[in-house]
Design a protein with these regions (language model features):
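Short beta-strand segments that buttress and anchor functional surface loops
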Residues: 45-48, 88-95, 104, 114-119
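Central antiparallel beta-sheet cores of small beta-barrel/beta-sandwich binding domains
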Residues: 53-109
Length: 138
């Protein structure tokens, strides 16, 4: 009987202190999703495709414009596959238009490597490009 009482007191003490211990434990701050893209310099960027496709310029306002280069419309759902200090990988689906998987690796705040593959309309795409800031948006 003494053991039952001791266990009950111990359990009450443990569960009484457990929530307090959680409050005192150091909290790990969560970085905002895709925060690497927030570090990229805003402005006009030039995309140089490795397959010889003509260069293309885009105005980078948030960095997220690089995710859906073949699907620039809104209304697409996105799923973050990987999100690290200098690499993001996002899978996206655009109902009625297709889908893609894009990987963006930061070399500097004005230079990134982009790899994307998927389906745009009824056509498959797969490209690798270097994106570099070239000035202010026009």
């Amino acid at each position: 009987m003494a053991k039952k009482g001791t266990s009950a007191v111990w359990l009450r003490g443990f569960f009484g202190l457990f929530p307090a211990a959680l409050l005192l434990a150091p909290a790990t701050a969560q970085a905002p999703a895709l925060s690497m893209l927030d570090h990229l310099q805003r402005g006009e960027w030039e995309l140089r495709f490795r397959d010889g496709t003509p260069t293309r310029k885009i105005c980078l306002r948030t960095g997220r414009e690089l995710i859906q280069l073949r699907h620039p419309q809104s209304g697409c759902s996105q799923y973050i596959v990987e999100d690290t200090r200098n690499l993001v990988k996002v899978q996206y689906t655009c109902p009625g238009s297709g889908y893609g998987l894009t990987s963006i690796r930061e070399e500097t705040s004005s230079l990134v490597q982009v790899q994307s593959a998927g389906l745009a309309g009824s056509r498959a795409f797969d490209f690798t490009a270097e994106a570099r800031r070239v000035g202010d948006c026009r």
